[in-house]
Amino acid sequence: KIPNPGGVNLITPNHLQETVFAIETDGKLYVSNSMTFVLVASGSKLIKKYKAYVADMGSILYGLKSDKLVKQSPLCNGRTLQYFRCCIAEIYRDLQIKEKTRYSGLEFSDFSDYKQKLIDILEAINNNATDKTRKMPYGMIGTISRGYDAPSVCALARYVGCSEVFTFVDNADDDGTEIANILGYTTIHRVNSKEYKSNERLLEAEAFASGETDPVFINFEDLYRNKLLLLGERGDSVYERLHSNANNDFDFHVGNQLSQASQTIFENMLKNNSIVIAVPLIGGDRWTDLKRISNSEDMKPFSIGEHYDRPISRRLLEEAGVKREMFGQRKYGGGISYSLDTFGRMRSKMSVKSFEALKGYRKMFPKFLWSDLCYKTKFYWVNRSIYLNYICSKLHLKQAFKGTGNDVGMLANPNATMMLCWGVELMKERYKDKY
């Protein structure tokens, strides 16, 4: 219960990477940065018939002011799961809540101003994290590739003493080892992104319990345990010179695509005492400043004049000694997604043990024939151009199908709620002895 007459303030991070969850029941408000934990603590359950949990969590990509931003989802017995993001929530003794948006308060005049402010903020974060009075001081690690965002973050991180990175090497063209050496990193872990497929720890369940659909990253949890994990998340938006959607409200949605990337790996981060620092999102609520800087006269020498053009990232790296042709030449993806897969196709993207466990759970999961059929019909119709173009690519035909042109809202994979419930059921074992 609220412990003092004045109530309390709930202050979330001022970025998209973390959500605070809350459930009110029997005159109490349960709050946690773990969805599974708050469900266990409050004795609440997900509604297995409800298809939109993952889409509700992903709706943050519409931005803080959109009417499509979902702030709560239904639970069993008339309860609701509340989402608090980028806000200060004033919670009163009667459990009434007054919420206001939390912005960074930053402004950027030019590249030098932006770079220095990022360095200052990273240094302050690192000083706090490594303070000797902490019971467990944090280390620091980054990820690196031959793209734009991850290596430019690593270039900044060197200013605050980061010396450790990991890179995927199964695609030689995206191996960031050479860039890491140039930047002065002394500990470089070279890993294979496909290693997760041999895991027997049911890592996929841990990812699904967070509303995430990509277990590739968390397979390397041993590398970032008890560390700050520096990522280039959303650099593909805020650093892209020609991006058409620059705004200051964290609106990162692209059509109806549900692409949450690393913003929902909280169960894994909590387990490993790790903190994600998505560097491009520091001041990401000043995206218009960053676009103006990217298109400024001073940045023209660092613009390649193409659609894949991120002058801020390029300048950070080239001024650190990385040659132009070594990075940002082609866009690669480091993860996987189940967002458009049928259940059968998921087999090739999961470890054998995890898929068999999920298949067993699916057999016991209740079937809702009519609502399932209606939802699947809508899902495949809205995404029909993607599937038709995929078929054309397999037949070596021209991909000519375009999207609907209508933003109907984000739709999660028809199996998403089942996958989420499976993950939550397994994660409950982690917390059940607490209550």
Model-derived features: where do they sit?
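Cysteine-centered catalytic environments shared across enzyme families
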Residues: K1-E195
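Phosphoinositide system proteins, centered on phosphoinositide phosphatases
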Residues: R384-S385, K394, A400-G403
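Generic recognition of stable, solvent-exposed alpha-helical segments in well-folded globular domains
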Residues: D120, Y148, S152, N171-D175, ...
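ATP-dependent adenylate-handling ligase core
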Residues: N171-L228, E233-Q260, T264-V276, L290-S303
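Mid-to-C-terminal catalytic subdomains of enzymes
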Residues: T264-Y390
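Hydrophobic (often cysteine-bearing) scaffold residues that line and stabilize catalytic clefts
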Residues: Y114-L122, A209, T213, G305, ...
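C-terminal non-catalytic accessory extensions
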Residues: Q399-Y435
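Short glycine-rich phosphate-binding loop at a beta-alpha junction
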Residues: G139-G142, L228-G232, L317
